[in-house]
A protein has these predicted regions:
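Long, C-terminal-biased catalytic regions of enzyme "large/alpha" subunits
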Residues: 1-251
Length: 251
């Protein structure tokens, strides 16, 4: 695991000066813009493969950040993450990078990536909403992607997910090379009140991105009848269609 962070960072840093991205005039040349963004893809897959829950991993990450040796497989994995992130930061500093880590929405990238068991990698570090997803593409039509028997958001819970996200951010931020994390909140689980804002400001998070609905029983807001039971909808529509016109056509 730690070796993967190092190899990934070295590949990014090597690529940085070869993209020619400044040729359009829209971006700074690589000699000026000393930034890359190494992130994480498929965390839910990795945890499943090692029989680790998000809750266990969050606790292990916190222990590692606190300098306490973690226990079991979760503790070993957390230690590998810490070692890998710190070692990758050393590589970035060799290349004089000013920023080197970022966790961003990676759905399109995840669709093109497989884990070591052949399942589609889940986007970034969050648990997915479901174990499979349909992607409707104008080019390829509807395609179904399977994540395998990973933990999904409704099973993980907000607190366990938030702890993993916070503790990973602490690890990245400790390097001094963090961009940030485009963090998706769960609108059907949390309440956006003063307490939420206060806890957010005290956390290591940098930005809120999408507001997602992750629970399986969330209403479909695309339907005007979403708040009604199906039977009520049918009765309502039938009541409109059934009555015969009550008028004197001669009038």
């Amino acid at each position: 695991m730690s070796k993967g962070f190092v190899e990934g960072m070295r590949s990014l840093c090597d690529l940085h000066s070869k993209t020619g991205i400044d040729s359009s005039g829209e971006y700074l040349p690589s000699r000026t813009d000393r930034q890359v963004g190494l992130g994480i893809l498929g965390l839910a897959n990795l945890l499943r493969q090692n029989n680790i829950t998000y809750e266990q991993f969050g606790e292990a990450l916190q222990a590692t950040n606190d300098g306490i040796p973690g226990l079991g497989t979760a503790g070993l994995l957390a230690a590998e993450f810490y070692k890998g992130i710190q070692s990758a930061a050393d590589v970035a500093k060799e290349y004089d990078m000013e920023r080197a880590f970022a966790i961003a929405p990676t759905a399109s990238c995840s669709y093109r990536s497989k884990d070591r068991e052949g399942f589609t990698c889940t986007p970034e570090i969050a648990p997915p909403i479901a174990r499979s997803v349909d992607r409707d593409s104008g080019t390829f039509g509807v395609q179904t992607y399977e994540y395998g028997d990973v933990e999904i958001a409704s099973e993980v819970g907000w607190d366990a997910y938030k702890k993993v996200a916070d503790q990973l951010m602490y690890m990245f931020n400790h390097t001094g090379l963090l961009h940030g994390y485009s963090f998706n909140s769960w609108s059907d689980v949390v309440t956006y009140d003063e307490q939420f804002v206060e806890e957010w400001l005290e956390s290591p998070q940098t930005s809120l991105y999408y507001s997602l609905q992750v629970m399986g029983d969330v209403q479909d807001k695309s339907s005007a009848y979403a708040a009604l039971d199906e039977e009520d909808v049918q009765d309502y529509l039938q009541g409109i269609l059934d009555p015969k016109p009550d008028c004197d056509c001669q009038e």
